[in-house]
Regions:
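Oxidoreductase cofactor-interface core, primarily capturing Rossmann-like NAD(P)-dependent enzymes
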Residues: 2-14, 24-34, 41-54, 61-70, ...
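Cofactor-binding loops of NAD(P)H-dependent oxidoreductases
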Residues: 21
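A hydrophobic C-terminal alpha-helical subdomain
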Residues: 172, 207-269
Length: 269
């Protein structure tokens, strides 16, 4: 077993073979990929100082140079193209613009997987906050009645990735495979949670008001606007979702099931 890390000296115990691999140091990637059949490539937009396009381009080139047979790239919808330039969501569009690099690289097989809006966000950056009226809930620039959130348990994305590697005949020719456990409006999310014993509230605020809440909120306001206008995936993706579930060999966890375990009542008080 081979483990990849940016600092192999600190992690020698991880595997029989521990190799340095740093997306910001392309010279480390060939040794990391050498001898592998496939590569699952993910970049992190939020990492300070990272350049996703540069990182992914270098990784794709290295994978091609050492003869990788199947590259699976973790992408997101191209908000710029879908919205005709109306919305600017770099952490979506930046990944989508790498799709062309993957397609043109000439791998025997390549696949695109699409991570959902994480259920885990509801105990992270989207966790309910105390509101001015004393309730716990959300104040977002989003119509809560619009069904637009394609969501899932991010821990299940690996089922789709593994399935793509196992079934290149079905999912190795540029197919897009989204992990979607549920497709809900924010009202439906709150109804689900409150039906489990919570008393969460929701207030719709303007994009301008939300943008002033905290650093980085302006981009999130753009994202919410895009979701409301076009949904998270941006198009009718029922066929892609069905194929992803078939490739994974299972149905993804529904939001209500996840929330019952992961958003206990004690977190609401």
């Amino acid at each position: 077993m081979r483990a990849l890390t940016r600092d192999p000296d600190k992690h020698r115990e991880l595997a029989e073979e521990v190799i340095e691999a740093d997306l910001d140091q392309p010279e480390t990637l060939k040794a990391a990929f050498e001898g592998a059949h496939g590569v699952f490539l993910v970049t992190n937009f939020r990492e300070k100082g990272s350049d996703e396009f540069k990182q992914a381009t270098a990784a794709v080139r290295a994978a091609k140079d050492v003869g990788i047979q199947h590259l699976v790239w973790s992408t997101l919808p191209n908000v710029e193209a879908i919205s005709g330039g109306k919305f600017d969501v770099p952490h979506f569009t930046g990944k989508a613009k790498i799709d062309r690099i993957v397609k043109e690289a000439g791998f025997p097989h390549h696949t695109f997987v699409i991570a959902p809006g994480y259920y885990q966000n509801f105990v992270g950056f989207l966790a309910p906050q105390k509101q001015a009226d004393g309730s716990m809930g959300w104040a977002l620039p989003l119509d809560p009645g619009v069904r637009c959130l394609h969501m899932g348990d991010i821990r299940e994305l690996g089922d789709i990735v593994a399935g793509a590697f196992a079934h290149p005949d079905q999912a190795g020719h540029g197919e897009y495979l989204p992990l979607i456990g549920d497709f809900l409006s924010f009202n439906e999310i709150i109804e689900t949670l409150n039906g489990q014993g919570h008393t969460f509230s929701f207030k719709q605020v303007s994009k301008e008001v939300f943008a002033a809440f905290f650093p980085g909120a302006a981009e999130l306001a753009e994202m919410f606007g895009y979701w409301e206008a076009h949904t998270y995936l941006g198009s009718d993706s029922s066929d892609r979702i069905a194929l992803a579930n078939k490739i994974a060999g299972r149905q993804p966890t529904r939001f209500s099931t996840w929330a019952r375990v992961n958003v206990p009542i004690k977190e609401a008080v």
